[in-house]
Design a protein with these regions (language model features):
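Catalytic active-site module of serine/aspartate enzymes centered on a nucleophile-bearing elbow/loop
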Residues: 263-296
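Conserved hydrolase catalytic core segment
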Residues: 98-142
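Alpha/beta-hydrolase
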Residues: 148, 159-236, 255
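Active-site loop/oxyanion-hole signature of alpha/beta-hydrolase fold enzymes
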Residues: 61-107, 111
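Flexible "cap/lid" loop of the alpha/beta hydrolase fold
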Residues: 125-166
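Conserved loop-alpha-helix segment in the C-terminal half of the alpha/beta-hydrolase fold
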Residues: 221-271
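Conserved HGGG/HGGXW glycine-rich cap/lid loop of the alpha/beta-hydrolase fold
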Residues: 14-73
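N-terminal cap/lid segment of alpha/beta-hydrolase-fold proteins
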Residues: 1-15
Length: 296
């Protein structure tokens, strides 16, 4: 039976929850998984657990401070890249992850790129940029472009809310939900994996303070995030993954692919924002091949 070890790391007077799946075998470096949000949790990454068993590779996932088992509230001073990067650095040290692969999904990819480009960490064997972005402005622009494919009344509701800053109108709530259903994910059905259905403490405060009120409007502490000028300096091999109907549009994914020197781009044509859920088997095979090719 696959070993799963859970624990907590003391961090800034709070506790960061982590979950380690499997054990390291041979020369296979562990894979650290950085979840999205900000304010989401590690839960959805549990659909990748069998990678540990099939590949003999340890997976390390954790709930970033502010959500899930690392829930903290009323601390807006914590919801910024500096704190989340410090948490990642301390977790690597705490768990002895001196050499590892990094996978960041959505906001987790922003965290990964900020860490790689501005903190020059050692021991990173490769990176996987899954449905992510190199700049907040680019994400916002692409979302607003895709909003134009919604019915006109939904476009109007989003435009009105964006202009007024009032996101409570039911028409806006319906429009935003439809947009996310088309490009992020829908509510998990009864036959979905348990990790996608079980109750979770999402860090809404972390999301709103860190990012903004919705995907179209980056107004938070991450609004000036932009590593576009540093992509050419990335030395680690990079696998870019995105979906054809993703919030991470093909334009965003190709922008990164064109600029990161040693990169490969895999487009899951029919997927939305969570390719690893929607095409789980194909995604795990892709990861296996990529990680084994980049362990040295």
């Amino acid at each position: 039976m696959m070993e799963i070890r859970e624990g907590y790391m003391p961090f800034m007077g709070y506790q960061t929850y982590y979950r380690m799946v499997g054990t390291q075998t041979g020369n296979k470096k562990p894979l650290i998984l950085l979840h999205g949000g900000p304010g989401s949790t590690h839960n959805y990454f549990e659909v990748l657990d069998r990678l540990a068993e099939e590949d003999g590779r340890q997976l390390v996932m954790y709930d970033q401070i502010g959500c899930g088992e690392s829930y903290v509230e009323d601390r807006p001073d914590l919801w910024n890249a500096e704190v989340w990067i410090r948490e990642l650095e301390e977790l690597r040290s705490h768990l002895g992850l001196s050499q590892a692969h990094l996978l960041g999904q959505s906001w987790g990819g922003m965290l990964l790129l900020e860490y790689l480009c501005n903190h020059e960490p050692e021991g990173i064997k490769s990176i996987i940029l899954s449905s992510t972005l190199p700049a907040s402005w680019m994400w916002g622009q692409e979302q607003m472009r895709m909003v134009r494919y919604l019915p006109q009344e939904m476009q109007d509701a989003i435009e009105k809310a964006t202009a007024s800053g009032d996101y409570s109108d039911p028409a806006y709530v319906e429009a935003e939900a439809e947009y996310m259903r088309r490009h992020a994910a829908e509510t998990p059905k009864e036959d979905a994996p348990d990790c996608l259905r079980r109750p979770v403490r999402k860090g809404l405060e972390a999301y709103i303070t860190g990012w903004g009120p919705n995907e179209f409007t980056p107004l938070g502490t991450l609004k000036d995030y932009d590593v576009t000028g540093q992509l050419r300096d990335i030395k680690a091999p990079a696998l870019i993954v995105s979906g054809g109907d993703d919030l991470c549009t093909p334009y965003i994914a190709k922008y990164m692919y064109d600029r990161i020197p040693e990169s490969r781009w895999e487009l899951f044509r029919t997927c939305r924002h969570m390719c690893f859920v929607e095409e789980n088997e194909q995604y795990i095979k892709l990861l296996k091949d990529w990680l084994n090719a980049n362990d040295e």
